């Protein structure tokens, strides 16, 4: 024994070494009771009997304290060795070994007495006494579904942590009186950490500790850690079993649990098993047991429990060996509603039952594969909830459309209950669109479907909850928020606002949000709940909340609230435009209106609408003209009272095939007249809709029942009542009423007042009702007689009847004064103190809208006292222009008072009229007529003749002042005038001898024409004067069309050049209109060409006449030394000899030197006979003479010297022979100028008998070579000079072209004037009829209009008109072609080949030395088909009224510049040309050649416009020509003949200067060509002469 004890003692530590050891047991007794046994420091082993004795002792003590235990069956404690212990499936007999139990833990063991009777339920096994603080927050408003969901929450949280592959099952079985909730979670046992009593003990659940693990993560936050308070299980079972908790607890518990007294549970049994446990532990709520606990005096709340083996069915449902089963007995449930319960449970746990990618607004984040997944298997009465098709969530899914809109919000709370820590919560908001389809709202369809399934929701479209909350994936069923502020967008009844009502928000929350104890709603006072509920309010936008911080994320990025709001609105409108389908179908044909819509007034967003008069909605037909009643609250602005109105039209947005269009009702309120209603008009096929005073209401007011039809009786009653109170007229308060209101406000209506009377400071207008008939002054200010007119604006317009402008225009809203409302107080005298100073009738117009109007007049008469005279306003613009010799225009003088009001003259006053200017200029006008008109208001003065010869005193502006004075009072009128000289009547010459003793090519010096009018005044500066000259040329750009200078003269000094020859007559005349008023004829001095050398009577054939001297003399025989050839100074005087003999060549020129010309040698012919030749001046052929001489045959002779050879077969005589030599012994003056062309043949021997010394010949040849070398150097220098002149001309051309850049930039070669183009036609098209016409036209004397009428033709097409740019000139000229451009234009069609006009034209061409060899086109205006559709009004160019082309949508065609026929500019004389029928050039000629030719900016514009050009040609400014036949001509070329360019006067001067410079350049280039040719010939000649010289030198040396 001692050894055994020592062994046993070794298990017990000394008190000094360690603490005490306690073993706690709950012993289940055979009689169904249990006792608690605690052992301190027991032996490691004790006998079974000793252990039973300890149990018996505790049992006896318990019986004494509890009467219920004393009534139980007694335990046979004397069973001896039959007792054994059973713990978790293991048995212990004989000896109890404590090593099998862990100290400090409570172990449940069952004591078996060996009788074979074993109980499975034991009294008071579990202690469920709660913490009283937890009982303060028990749930309220429980329902059957929410209570059942509380039990399922526990099951879901139990099964969720299981690994993949383990069965996750929650099975609910419900019958009429029994409910079973079974799950395959980890289960419970009797262990301290997982004891089954925690399920039933309020606040003991371990699920609450897992809450923090469900904060954060990814939406939809599927972590079912729902535990919050720890009483979901017991409280739900109490509710479902209708338990009566009227048992005894401590006083605080009793007070708190009074709300639970309605529950009366019969029995609830909880059975649970863990995977490690072999036994199933049970816990039971039973009414009898709870009542029996009252004997415990409320210290403990205990309930029965037990331990048993698992059933076969339980192990089948949970193959892995763990489960929990809650059974509620004697429950009350209507089994016929089992389907609705299944649908409800599916709604609550939808994400945990199933999810797929298609369920876009729930759990799409969890679906990685796109297929439907089943996280947990839910069964209700054996039916899988995933296979149940009903439920609000499933039905909602079916009716949503389009993409969702989502974002996440992170809420952070600093402070709160836990100071110094930050709390966090997360929410994901998904917005789904439920469109209106075929006129029915999808939300209404959802409600209808729920009603059909028996799951009716007591909501309508208006009250439908548009926010659904899930916390950790579990629906909070009582959250049926109408919306959150973020979802409320747009003005009331706007498209955006209506579309937002079709959005539902699905909110997923994490565990950071706290629910109510019943988990049916969010805790209302929680800061996160408040922040979510108010998201989108102004406080959210401005972030004024100092506690909760909000961070928004969308698509993984942080976004601002403003950006989020913008994107949300865009999404809503996109969904509306894409998916909404209004079903308000019009029963009549729609009128389509595109654009020109007041979208704000109509409440629409689109640019196109369809207007109907009749639609069908809600199985009813609604028509235009139908009377309706709109109930208050139906629409913005309809708040306080119902509105009666008449339907005008129905408006549907968009085209027929477009979705998203809203339907609206346009109706006119009953208080608005018919003419202020909506107006639909169609003008020229264009529809227009004017809203005016009608209301635009959404069609949905019919759907909501807020719009009702009104029968005739109700309408008439309302109309009568409305008309009685309706505003009827506007009235002005009189002096008495204004005085009572303390307002200076009487308007002098009906009586006339004198100008200058002060107007009242204010006037008061009121609106009287229709029932107002009292004239009693005391009642005019009664409020019942004054309509308040709240919000109605009155307009007062003050206008003087004689003026088109408003004097004053004021707009006011009504105010109140002394308790009287509806007063419109307008400021008058305080704002316009000078109002009544102008005489006339003042019209005061008062109006409210277009229905209530009032007009009052005030007559103001002018003052009776005259103050001044003034010219009447009807005069034309000043200063007044008058010519000497004519009368001034009539003057109208009015008399005015001091307020500038016109008053009548009492009589015709005596007048003094003078024209005054600078000192010394005064013209009295005595000839005039005066009379009074317009009832004496106007003094008319007329026929004032102006005559004077003193205008030169006030030139050049001719400004003067006309003074009209009254002789009997101090009134006068001054009129600025401009007295211009009369027309040209006389011409004087400053130097009459300037046109005497004229010589050819001389320039007239000191020759000035003075031009006078008929009163001997110099004519005005700038006057156009036509000078006709014959034999002269004016050498400047102005030519014969001259302008008078500032002195009244035309200076021709130095520019008038003689062009005729010696002895010819010349003339100069000045034209005034068609009259010649000055003519000066002169004769050029005569000269004679004489031969000074005496000729022999006869000469031998083949010899030379030597040293012939010719002179130019005057008639008296004196030598004219001015005839001198000087090429450098431009004086060319040479002589030519012409003969029929081939031996004399006319190409030789002989130079005159101071009047004499010497011919050193003139070869005679080889044949005998009479030799004759004509000698003449090369430039003046009238200086000529003829030479005749007899030529005889030469006798035969021998050589006088033999052995002397000559370079030729012929010899020349030696110098001493006395025979004339052909050589010139001295250099002729001609050689100095390079004019005399000495040919090589001139060195030949003139006779076979002539002999020449070889040395002399060689010397002469050398001298000739030197002369030619000098000439070559001179030619090269001259070429350099010409080159410089050409370069200067090119630079000048470039400068002038730059100044004309806008005109000639594209094609400067087309930059020309009419004169230059005429000259070009004349020169380059020599054999054409157009060239002949231009030549005749240029030579015709003025006026040329007379020439045109005589010829019966108007000109050439190319010269009739001009264009604005060179690019337009080029393309139009190329379009017409050269033949058309050179066509002659005549009036009559009689200009045929056999007509007199044609033959006359041909004869005139022959007289010019021209022949018309080419065919030419004649266009007859009378024969063309003119344009007959009218001209553009008030257009000085008389353009054709042609409609511009348009695109099919009505827009103008891009790049269109105009019609070619209208782009031709016509001069004034061309505008006067008409056919016999009165049609002008544009209507006949140009319309005939161009028709409807269209001009475009570029080829791209032309190509784009081709499909829209019907039956016509088109061109572009860059050169493309498109013909009607489909041919398109591209490329670029410059036509030979083109239209001149339209230029200003300044541009014309530059253009003329450009033409002169071009001509100089052209002449310089021609001279350079000629000089180069001469240089080449001279170089060739020098080469041959040098070769000869070398040969002769060699012969002489030999």
From Swiss-Prot:
Q: When the coding gene is removed by deletion, what phenotypic consequences does the entry describe?
A: No visible phenotype under normal growth conditions, but mutant seedlings exhibit drastic reduction of somatic homologous recombination rate after treatment with bleocin or mitomycin C.
Q: What induces it?
A: Induced by mitomycin C, bleocin and gamma-irradiation.
Q: Where is this region: Disordered?
A: 1191-1218
Tissue specificity, in the record's words, reads: Highly expressed in closed buds and open flowers. Expressed at low levels in roots, stems, cauline leaves and siliques. Expressed in the region of the shoot and floral meristems.
Q: Which GO terms describe its biological process?
A: double-strand break repair via homologous recombination
UniProt keyword annotation of Nucleus present? yes
Give its localization: Nucleus
Q: What is its main location?
A: nucleus
- Quote the cellular component terms of the Gene Ontology held in the record: nucleus
Using the record for this protein, list the coiled-coil segments as residue ranges, or answer none.
1258-1301, 1565-1595
Ordered alphabetically, the record's keywords are: Coiled coil, DNA damage, DNA repair, Nucleus
According to its UniProt entry, the function of this protein is described as: Contributes to DNA double-strand break (DSB) repair via somatic homologous recombination. Functions downstream of ATM.
PANTHER family for this protein: EN/SPM-LIKE TRANSPOSON-RELATED, EN_SPM-LIKE TRANSPOSON-RELATED
The name under which this protein is listed is: Structural maintenance of chromosomes flexible hinge domain-containing protein GMI1
Q: Which gene encodes it?
A: GMI1
């Amino acid at each position: 024994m001692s050894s055994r004890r020592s062994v046993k003692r070794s298990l017990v530590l000394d008190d000094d070494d360690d603490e005490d050891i306690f073993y706690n047991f709950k012993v289940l007794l055979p009689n169904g009771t249990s006792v608690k046994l605690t052992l301190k420091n027991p032996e490691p082993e004790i006998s079974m009997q000793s252990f039973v004795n300890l149990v018996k002792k505790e049992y006896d003590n318990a019986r004494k304290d509890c009467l219920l235990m004393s009534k139980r069956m007694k335990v046979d404690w004397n069973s001896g060795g039959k007792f054994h212990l059973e713990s978790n499936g293991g048995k212990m007999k004989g000896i109890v070994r404590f090593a099998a139990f862990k100290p400090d833990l409570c172990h449940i063991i069952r004591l078996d007495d060996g009788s074979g009777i074993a109980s499975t339920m034991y009294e008071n096994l579990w202690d469920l006494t709660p913490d009283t603080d937890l009982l303060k927050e028990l749930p309220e408003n429980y329902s059957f579904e929410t209570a059942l969901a509380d039990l399922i929450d526990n099951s879901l949280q139990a099964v969720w942590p299981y690994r993949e592959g383990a069965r996750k099952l929650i099975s609910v079985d419900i019958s009429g009186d029994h409910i079973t909730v079974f799950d395959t979670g980890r289960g419970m046992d009797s262990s301290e950490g997982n004891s089954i009593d925690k399920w039933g003990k309020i606040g003991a659940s371990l699920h609450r500790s897992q809450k923090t693990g469900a904060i954060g993560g990814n939406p939809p936050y599927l972590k079912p850690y729902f535990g919050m308070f720890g009483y979901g299980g017991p409280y739900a079972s109490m509710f479902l079993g209708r338990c009566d908790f009227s048992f005894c607890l401590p006083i605080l518990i009793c007070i708190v649990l009074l709300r639970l007294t309605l529950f009366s549970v019969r029995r609830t049994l909880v059975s649970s098993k863990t995977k490690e446990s072999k036994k199933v532990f049970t816990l039971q709520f039973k009414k009898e047991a709870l009542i029996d606990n009252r004997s415990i005096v409320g210290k403990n709340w205990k309930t029965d429990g037990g331990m048993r083996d698992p059933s076969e069915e339980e192990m089948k449902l949970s193959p892995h060996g763990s489960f929990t089963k809650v059974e509620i007995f004697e429950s009350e449930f209507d089994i016929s509603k089992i389907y609705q319960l299944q649908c409800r449970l599916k709604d609550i746990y939808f994400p945990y039952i199933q999810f797929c990618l298609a369920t876009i607004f729930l759990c799409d984040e969890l679906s990685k594969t796109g297929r439907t997944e089943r996280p947990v298997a839910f069964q209700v009465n054996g039916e899988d909830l995933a296979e149940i098709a009903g439920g609000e969530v499933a039905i909602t899914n079916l009716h949503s459309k389009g993409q969702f809109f989502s974002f996440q919000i992170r809420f952070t709370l600093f402070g709160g209950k836990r100071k110094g820590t930050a709390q966090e919560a997360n929410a994901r908001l998904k917005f789904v669109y439920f469109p209106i389809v075929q006129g029915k709202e999808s939300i209404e369809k959802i409600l209808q479907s729920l009603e059909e399934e028996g799951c009716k929701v007591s909501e309508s479209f208006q009250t439908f909850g548009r926010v659904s909350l899930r916390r950790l994936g579990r629906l909070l069923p009582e959250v049926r928020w109408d919306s959150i502020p973020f979802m409320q967008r747009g003005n009331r009844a706007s498209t955006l606002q209506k579309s937002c009502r079709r959005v539902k928000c699905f909110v997923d929350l994490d565990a950071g949000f706290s629910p109510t104890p019943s988990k049916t709603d969010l805790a209302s006072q929680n800061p996160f709940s408040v922040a979510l509920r108010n998201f989108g309010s102004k406080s959210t936008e401005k972030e004024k909340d100092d506690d909760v911080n909000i961070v928004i994320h969308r698509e993984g990025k942080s976004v601002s609230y403003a950006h989020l709001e913008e994107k949300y609105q865009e999404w809503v409108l996109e969904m509306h435009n894409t998916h909404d389908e209004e079903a308000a179908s019009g029963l009549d044909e729609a009128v389509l209106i595109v654009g020109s819509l007041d979208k704000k007034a109509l409440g629409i967003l689109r640019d196109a609408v369809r207007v109907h008069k009749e639609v069908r909605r809600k199985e009813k037909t609604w028509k235009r003209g139908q009377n309706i009643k709109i109930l208050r609250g139906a629409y913005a602005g309809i708040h306080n009272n119902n509105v009666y109105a008449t339907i005008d039209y129905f408006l549907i947005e968009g085209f027929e095939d477009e979705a998203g269009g809203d339907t609206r009702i346009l109706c006119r309120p009953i208080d608005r007249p018919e003419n202020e209603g909506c107006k639909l008009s169609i003008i020229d096929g264009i529809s227009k809709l004017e809203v005016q005073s009608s209301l635009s209401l959404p069609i949905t007011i019919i759907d909501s029942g807020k719009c009702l039809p009104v029968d005739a009786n109700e309408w008439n009653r309302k109309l009568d009542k409305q008309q009685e109170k309706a505003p009827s007229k506007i009235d002005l308060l009189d002096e008495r009423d204004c005085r009572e209101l303390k307002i200076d406000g009487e308007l002098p209506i009906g009586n006339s007042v004198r100008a200058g009377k002060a107007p009242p400071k204010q006037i008061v207008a009121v609106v009287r009702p229709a029932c107002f008939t009292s004239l009693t002054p005391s009642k005019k200010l009664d409020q019942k007689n004054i309509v308040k007119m709240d919000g109605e604006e009155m307009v007062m317009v003050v206008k003087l009847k004689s003026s088109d402008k408003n004097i004053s225009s004021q707009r006011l809203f009504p105010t109140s004064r002394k308790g009287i409302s509806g007063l419109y107080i307008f400021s008058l005298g305080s704002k316009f103190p000078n109002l009544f100073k102008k005489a006339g009738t003042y019209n005061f117009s008062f109006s409210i809208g277009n229905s209530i109007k009032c007009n009052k007049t005030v007559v103001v008469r002018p003052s009776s006292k005259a103050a001044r005279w003034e010219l009447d306003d009807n005069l034309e613009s000043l200063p007044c222009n008058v010519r000497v010799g004519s009368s001034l225009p009539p003057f109208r003088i009015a008399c005015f008072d001091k307020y500038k009001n016109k008053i009548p003259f009492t009589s015709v006053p005596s007048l003094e009229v003078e024209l005054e200017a600078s000192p010394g200029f005064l013209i009295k006008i005595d000839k005039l007529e005066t009379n009074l008109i317009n009832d004496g208001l106007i003094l008319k003065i007329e026929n004032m003749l102006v005559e004077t010869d003193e205008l030169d005193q006030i030139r050049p502006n001719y400004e003067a002042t006309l003074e009209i004075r009254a002789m009997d009072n101090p009134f006068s009128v001054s009129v600025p005038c401009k007295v211009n000289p009369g027309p040209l009547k006389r011409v004087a010459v400053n130097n009459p001898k300037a046109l005497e003793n004229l010589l050819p090519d001389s320039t007239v010096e000191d020759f000035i024409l003075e031009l006078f009018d008929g009163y001997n005044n110099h004519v005005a500066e700038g006057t156009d004067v036509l000078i006709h000259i014959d034999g002269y040329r004016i050498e400047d750009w102005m030519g014969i069309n001259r302008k008078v200078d500032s002195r009244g003269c035309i200076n021709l000094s130095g520019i008038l050049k003689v062009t005729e020859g010696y002895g010819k007559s010349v003339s100069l005349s000045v034209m005034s209109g068609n009259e010649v008023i000055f003519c000066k004829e002169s004769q050029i001095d005569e000269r004679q060409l004489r031969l000074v050398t005496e000729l022999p009577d006869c000469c031998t054939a083949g010899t030379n006449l030597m040293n012939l001297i010719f002179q130019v003399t005057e008639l008296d025989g004196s030598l004219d030394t001015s005839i001198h050839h000087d090429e450098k100074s431009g004086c060319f005087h040479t002589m030519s000899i012409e003969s029929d003999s081939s031996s004399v060549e006319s190409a030789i020129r002989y130079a005159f030197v101071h009047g004499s010309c010497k011919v050193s040698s003139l070869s005679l012919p080889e044949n005998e006979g009479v030799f004759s030749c004509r000698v003449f001046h090369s430039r003046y052929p009238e200086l000529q003479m003829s030479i005749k001489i007899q030529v005889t045959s030469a006798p035969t002779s021998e050589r006088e010297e033999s052995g002397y050879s000559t370079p030729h077969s012929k010899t020349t005589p030696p110098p001493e022979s006395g025979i004339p030599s052909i050589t010139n012994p001295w250099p002729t003056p001609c050689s100095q100028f390079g004019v005399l062309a000495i040919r090589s043949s001139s060195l030949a021997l003139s006779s076979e008998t002539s002999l020449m010394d070889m040395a002399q010949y060689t010397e002469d040849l050398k001298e000739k070579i030197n002369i030619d070398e000098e000439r070559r150097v001179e030619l090269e220098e001259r070429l350099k000079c010409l080159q410089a002149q050409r370069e200067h001309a090119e630079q000048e051309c470039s400068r002038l072209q730059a100044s004309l850049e806008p005109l000639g930039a594209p094609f400067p070669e087309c930059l020309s004037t009419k004169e230059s183009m005429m000259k070009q036609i004349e020169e380059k098209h020599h054999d054409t009829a157009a060239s002949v016409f231009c030549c005749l036209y240029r030579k015709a004397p003025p006026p040329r209009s007379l020439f045109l009428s005589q010829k019966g033709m108007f000109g050439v097409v190319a010269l009739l008109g001009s264009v604005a740019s060179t690019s337009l000139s080029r393309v139009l000229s190329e379009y017409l072609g050269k033949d058309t451009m050179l066509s002659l234009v005549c009036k009559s069609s009689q200009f045929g080949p056999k007509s007199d006009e044609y033959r006359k034209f041909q004869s005139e061409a022959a007289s010019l030395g021209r022949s018309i060899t080419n065919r030419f086109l004649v266009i007859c205006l009378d024969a063309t088909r003119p344009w007959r559709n009218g001209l553009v009004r008030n257009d000085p160019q008389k353009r054709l009224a042609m409609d511009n082309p348009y695109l099919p949508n009505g827009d103008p065609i891009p790049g269109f510049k105009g019609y070619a026929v209208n782009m031709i500019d016509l001069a004034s004389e061309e505008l006067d040309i008409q056919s016999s029928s009165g049609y002008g050039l544009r209507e006949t000629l140009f319309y005939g050649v161009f028709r409807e030719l269209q001009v475009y900016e570029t080829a791209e514009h032309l190509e784009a416009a081709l499909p829209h050009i019907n039956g016509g040609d088109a061109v572009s400014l860059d050169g493309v020509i498109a013909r009607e036949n489909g041919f398109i001509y591209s490329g670029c070329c410059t036509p030979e003949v083109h239209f001149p360019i339209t230029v200003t006067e300044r541009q014309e001067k530059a253009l003329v200067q450009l033409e002169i410079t071009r001509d100089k350049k052209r002449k310089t280039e021609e001279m350079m060509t000629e000089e180069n040719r001469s240089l080449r010939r001279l170089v060739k000649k020098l080469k041959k002469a040098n070769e000869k010289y070398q040969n002769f030198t060699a012969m002489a040396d030999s």
